[in-house]
Structure formats: structure tokens, C-alpha cells
């Protein structure tokens, strides 16, 4: 299905693509196969996505590959993906920050590798002791026995 291909190209979920297709079609009343940048901006607003006019202009220029000044469905999907996927990443960053803060009880900006072992074990109980040691050695490059937030982030998102 074309939606399946779009999902692969954009990294969006199929359900998201269906919703976006409906939004696109409802604005493309004459079934021309494209909508105006202004319409795109309205759709994004309806989806609760805030975007400044400057960055919106830049994105439109980037997305409107054929320079038609009109946004075809595939271009529209690429644009929506930028916002939807970035939001997911931001949400994940927030969750990781909170998880880190929870374990960094003294607020030192780092956790011990022992604490990290416990976190990893909670995330995946199938990890063996050897695997845990391997992961820890990879993360705690300087062998300090502590892991700061950046090292933690790199591990979780890498």
C-alpha cells in the first residue's frame, strides 16, 4: 500500500498517515492533489503543533521540492514527520531526564555505575551480569565509576 511506503520513507506510524491523509483530503476539496502552504500551517495548528513563521517558511522551501508553491501529499507528509517525530524525541528526552533525576538523589549530576546496572536490569531483565559489565564499560569510558547525564543519554538514544 502507498501508506506503507510512506511509513518507511517518513518514519511515521501508519495511523498517523491515515489521519494526515484525511486532513489533506478535506482541505484539497477540488482533489487537485496539492494544498497551499497556508493550509498546511492551518493543519499543523489544528494538530497542536506550534511553529514560528520563519522556520515554517524555511521548511516549506525545503519540502516544496519542485518549487511549485503547492504542497503535494508526499511533501506534506515529510513536513508533518519533521514535527511529529521531533516531538517524540523531545518527550523521550524529558522522560530520560526524569529517570536520571530520580536516581541522582543527591542531585550531583551523575549516577554510579551500580545504580545504572539496576536501571538497565529493570529495563531488560534478560541481561546477564557479563552483558551488564560490558555495557557499563562502554559507557563509563573514563572508568570513573560514575555516569553523567550526557553519557546516560548517549547510551539510551544510541
Curated annotation (Swiss-Prot):
Q: Does the keyword Acetylation apply?
A: yes
What more the UniProt record tells us is: There are two different troponin C in barnacle.
Extract the Gene3D superfamilies matched here.
EF-hand
Q: Which InterPro entries match?
A: CALM/Myosin/TropC-like, EF-hand-dom_pair, EF_Hand_1_Ca_BS, EF_hand_dom
Give the signal peptide, or none: none
Q: Which domain of life is it from?
A: Eukaryota
Keywords on this record? Acetylation, Calcium, Metal-binding, Muscle protein, Repeat
Binding residues annotated for Ca(2+) 2, in chain numbering: 140, 142, 144, 146, 151
GO CC, any one term: myosin II complex
The role this protein plays is: Troponin is the central regulatory protein of striated muscle contraction. Tn consists of three components: Tn-I which is the inhibitor of actomyosin ATPase, Tn-T which contains the binding site for tropomyosin and Tn-C. The binding of calcium to Tn-C abolishes the inhibitory action of Tn on actin filaments.
Q: N-acetylserine-modified residues are where? A: 1
Q: Which PROSITE patterns does this UniProt record tie to the protein?
A: EF_HAND_1, EF_HAND_2
Record's family? Belongs to the troponin C family.
Locate the EF-hand domain: which residues? Answer: 15-50, 51-86, 91-126, 127-158
Name the record gives this protein: Troponin C, isoform 1
Name of one Pfam family that matches: EF-hand_7
Amino acid at each position: 500500500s502507498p501508506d506503507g511506503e510512506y511509513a518507511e520513507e517518513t518514519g511515521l506510524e501508519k495511523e498517523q498517515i491515515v489521519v494526515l491523509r484525511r486532513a489533506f483530503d478535506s482541505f484539497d476539496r477540488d482533489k487537485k492533489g496539492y494544498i497551499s502552504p497556508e493550509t498546511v500551517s492551518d493543519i499543523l495548528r489544528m494538530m497542536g503543533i506550534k511553529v514560528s513563521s520563519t522556520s515554517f517558511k524555511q521548511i516549506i522551501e525545503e519540502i516544496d521540492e519542485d518549487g511549485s508553491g503547492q504542497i503535494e501529499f508526499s511533501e506534506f507528509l515529510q513536513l508533518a514527520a519533521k514535527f511529529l517525530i521531533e516531538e517524540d524525541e523531545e518527550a523521550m528526552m524529558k522522560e530520560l531526564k526524569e529517570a536520571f533525576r530520580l536516581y541522582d538523589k543527591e542531585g550531583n549530576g551523575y549516577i554510579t555505575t551500580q545504580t545504572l546496572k539496576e536501571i538497565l536490569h529493570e529495563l531488560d531483565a534478560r541481561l546477564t551480569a557479563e552483558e551488564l559489565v560490558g555495557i557499563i564499560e562502554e559507557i563509563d569510558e573514563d572508568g570513573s565509576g560514575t555516569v553523567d547525564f550526557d553519557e546516560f543519554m548517549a547510551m539510551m538514544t544510541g
